[in-house]
Design a protein with these regions (language model features):
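Conserved acidic catalytic loop of the alpha/beta-hydrolase fold
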Residues: 43-57
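Short beta-strand/loop motif that positions the catalytic acidic residue
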Residues: 100, 106-108
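Gly/Ala-rich beta-loop-alpha elbow adjacent to hydrolase catalytic centers
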Residues: 62-70
Length: 178
């Protein structure tokens, strides 16, 4: 289940979701949020997971604000959720996942000027010790999705396709761990 970034349409993550589905053989659900803000429905994954009762193991994740909400959801979720993907995101101060047993991957573009890097680093203290971190060299904030440039973001020095290829590879590695 993938939560979109704040004020970003879920369809903006369709290329990423499609690549995960095709390359990983996994079903991917893009969560539609009220006003395109996951903060208004952080529990949206419940309905998506309940609609697919044949799937026993789930990973939740999200981009930016959607990632913070996915982390909060993962903290309080049932045992169906086994992993967490954070794309240019970190858990809120109130979200403690260090002892959660979740498999986690956290990705950030080296040119991301939207995420406050010291706060991202502090968020790592609330994640499991075996969290996999990947800084995508040349990547930025917006290229985790397909919604164009984002005000305040850095200029990517790699293509969106390259950034998403690296993102998919990291997510597929996580899928292999659960």
């Amino acid at each position: 289940v993938l939560y979109p970034g704040g004020r970003v349409a879920p369809e903006s993550y369709a290329p990423l979701a499609r690549a995960i589905a095709v390359e990983g053989g996994a079903e991917v659900a893009l969560a539609s949020m009220p006003l395109n803000l996951a903060v208004f429905d952080p529990g949206r994954a419940d309905a998506l997971m309940d609609a697919a009762p044949g799937i026993q193991r789930w990973i939740v994740g999200g981009h930016s604000l959607g990632g913070a909400m996915a982390a909060a959801y993962a903290m309080s979720s049932d045992d169906r959720v086994r992993g967490l993907v954070l794309l240019a995101a970190y858990p809120a101060d109130s979200t403690e996942l260090a002892d959660s047993g979740l498999a986690v991957v956290s990705l950030l573009g080296s040119e991301d000027d939207v995420v406050d890097r010291p706060t991202w680093d502090e968020g790592a203290e609330r994640l499991p010790a075996d969290t996999v971190y990947l800084i995508i060299e040349g990547g930025n904030h917006a290229q985790f999705g397909d919604y164009g440039e984002q005000p305040g973001d850095g200029v990517a020095t790699i293509s969106a396709a390259d950034q998403q290829r690296q993102t998919v590879a990291a997510i597929l590695e996580l899928l292999g761990r659960i």
